Amino acid sequence: VGFKAGVKDYKLTYYTPEYKTKDTDILAAFRVTPQPGVPPEEAGAAVAAESSTGTWTTVWTDGLTSLDRYKGRCYHIETVTGEENQFIVYVAYPLDLFEEGSVTNMFTSIVGDVFGFKALRALRLEDLRIPPAYSKTFQGPPHGIQVERDKLNKYGRPLLGCTIKPKLGLSAKNYGRAVYECLRGGLDFTKDDENVNSQPFMRWRDRFLFCAEALYKAQAETGEIKGHYLNATAGTCEEMIKRAVFARELGVPIVMHDYLTGGFTANTTLSYYCRDNGLLLHIHRAMHAVIDRQKNHGIHFRVLAKALRMSGGDHIHSGIVVGKLEGERDITLGFVDLLRDDLVEEDRSRGIYFTQDWVSLPGVLPVASGGIHVWHMPALTEIFGDDSVLQFGGGTLGHPWGNAPGAVANRVALEACVQARNEGRDLAREGNEIIREASKWSPELAAACEVWKEIKFEFEAMDTL
């Protein structure tokens, strides 16, 4: 029998509502906005086709393989309530379509060409179900939450961080001084800003040396293990690894990477190096809002978070529910759970479309940062719990008396909140009172409370269900 040339509807091949999903399938939930006149079944089938085996016309080489075995299948469609002409389309992909241990390949398939497809007005990948058969091919985070706590010898509370500001323009020596003051004051970590790489005013090697000196000095004086996220992000993978090697030689505990601008291949490479050499890996998500901020087009951050857990990172910025950078509470807590927990049940009220079983892949600490200060501490402690990093940049360095008192204020506020919680007090209701009580015996905290008592960033969150 000759093959039948020509263009035929995608839905004839790729829309299979009777399909029963397999445990090994990768499942995707897309928010699809078809062009006017395109039925949802055709749009859903087109997404399945273009992100797996299909092309725009029938080709004779289709006969050389088993399409039934390899094709993506649109198996369910539901309308989005309250939105006109918007659908959630569920697609199942056979596992054979993906290279083992490669987030890069997974994304190239699932969100490659299909987002430019003309029959769709807009397309957003809302969630992915990664089957254990696939997640087991990834190393995941270099160390994970428990190993990190054991390395740092810090338990029972969130960790405190601070991004050194101004983010660009300081010399290496002045930068190191700021790091020392913050760590000496009581923070656990300080952080390179995501755009600090190796610029003319401060080359990476000088920064690494002065930060290591600051770290060891603060450690000796406080008796606590300290860290500074040394940003190893670079223009090439080789240069990035060179920086990570130097960090290891200095004996520091943690390095950092910008995983979206650096790319998943570079990130996974660095993650492997970090596990092999005992370095923790802090991940910044610079550029994420370009991809995830539009409600009807792009990729939701919960997918980028899952991808990071597979690719590898011990911390990742996860947005906050208070402060200057947006995050909607239930949705944020949904992907915070996806980062930390072993098994996360489907829960549409939190934007989780699939039950995700990570089969003991190490967890990632969510990092809350962006416009937060001491008055937010009770809310942050309650919302994020112990397994998190709370990062105050301006909220430390903006203290009227300087960096070290700023760090003291944050540490006192945190310890007060943790103690109050452990005594059974309600942080949501009594938060301000707890901070006020603590500030009576901490002049540093009292000064911080005075400076930031009126500051609010109140805008509508873009990211709603």
UniProtKB/Swiss-Prot annotation:
The keyword 4Fe-4S does not apply. SUPFAM superfamilies: RuBisCo, C-terminal domain, RuBisCO, large subunit, small (N-terminal) domain. PROSITE patterns: RUBISCO_LARGE. RuBisCO catalyzes two reactions: the carboxylation of D-ribulose 1,5-bisphosphate, the primary event in carbon dioxide fixation, as well as the oxidative fragmentation of the pentose substrate in the photorespiration process. Both reactions occur simultaneously and in competition at the same active site. Belongs to the RuBisCO large chain family. Type I subfamily. CDD domains: RuBisCO_large_I (cd08212). It comes from Trochodendron aralioides (Wheel tree). The gene is rbcL. One of its GO terms (cellular component) is chloroplast. The disulfide bond which can form in the large chain dimeric partners within the hexadecamer appears to be associated with oxidative stress and protein turnover. It is found in: Plastid, Chloroplast. This is Ribulose bisphosphate carboxylase large chain. Heterohexadecamer of 8 large chains and 8 small chains; disulfide-linked. The disulfide link is formed within the large subunit homodimers. Keywords: Calvin cycle, Carbon dioxide fixation, Chloroplast, Disulfide bond, Lyase, Magnesium, Metal-binding, Methylation, Monooxygenase, Oxidoreductase, Photorespiration, Photosynthesis, Plastid. The record marks 324 as: Transition state stabilizer. The modification N6,N6,N6-trimethyllysine is found at residue 4. The active site is at residues 165, 284. Substrate binds at residues 163, 167, 285, 317, 369. GO terms for biological process: photorespiration; reductive pentose-phosphate cycle. The modification N6-carboxylysine is found at residue 191.
